[in-house]
Amino acid sequence: MAASGESGTSGGGGSTEEAFMTFYSEVKQIEKRDSVLTSKNQIERLTRPGSSYFNLNPFEVLQIDPEVTDEEIKKRFRQLSILVHPDKNQDDADRAQKAFEAVDKAYKLLLDQEQKKRALDVIQAGKEYVEHTVKERKKQLKKEGKPTIVEEDDPELFKQAVYKQTMKLFAELEIKRKEREAKEMHERKRQREEEIEAQEKAKREREWQKNFEESRDGRVDSWRNFQANTKGKKEKKNRTFLRPPKVKMEQRE
């Protein structure tokens, strides 16, 4: 009975210890999560070198899982926007403004269901790529007769791999978007230059035609004046040199 009692106490103690460790682990996770919920840390995170690419993932900006509800997204936005608002961080207003803009942009993007779906598709593509890569590596290890153990078997390392691949995909899409915009802008500029050139050409042609018509009218008037003057001179000349007929003197016998 004593042995049984000791065993029960031991078992109960083990269960209590496991519960305590679970509770302690949860507390540490909460402390870790809350440790970044300071204005300074959030501004630093959102404006660190490379943030222009890190912040392309709206879920990463708001530090939320892709599966969260719209209500949780709104709650997180309010929380972060207050932390990084420039009015609250006047000693670091410029960076606070950049951080606030990143949070605001991510929030608005996730409110748009179409853009949210695109972001989710990128994240899913990153996850599928890592899963495929891990599968191929395991297949190769098995073929070589080696243990089929890879780093990504660790859930945390798998998560990190997905994060890196997802960030890479977001960056590639952003680069392509900028290239497409630059190309479109160049095309619009080229078309505008052609329109301006066509307008200037048409203007030059109109001016030439106008000048030609005016000069033609002038030439016609000059020719008419010339003809009139010439005719007048001829008539005057004819009148000047007109000689009366000779009168034959009558001879008397």
Curated annotation (Swiss-Prot):
A motif (Nuclear localization signal) lies at residues 189-192, 203-206. Residues 231-240 have a biased composition (Basic residues). Residues 181-222 have a biased composition (Basic and acidic residues). It is found in: Nucleus. Keywords: Acetylation, Chaperone, Nucleus, Phosphoprotein. Residues 232-253 are annotated as: Essential for polyglutamine aggregation suppression. Suppresses polyglutamine (polyQ) aggregation of ATXN3 in neuronal cells. This is DnaJ homolog subfamily C member 8. It comes from Homo sapiens.
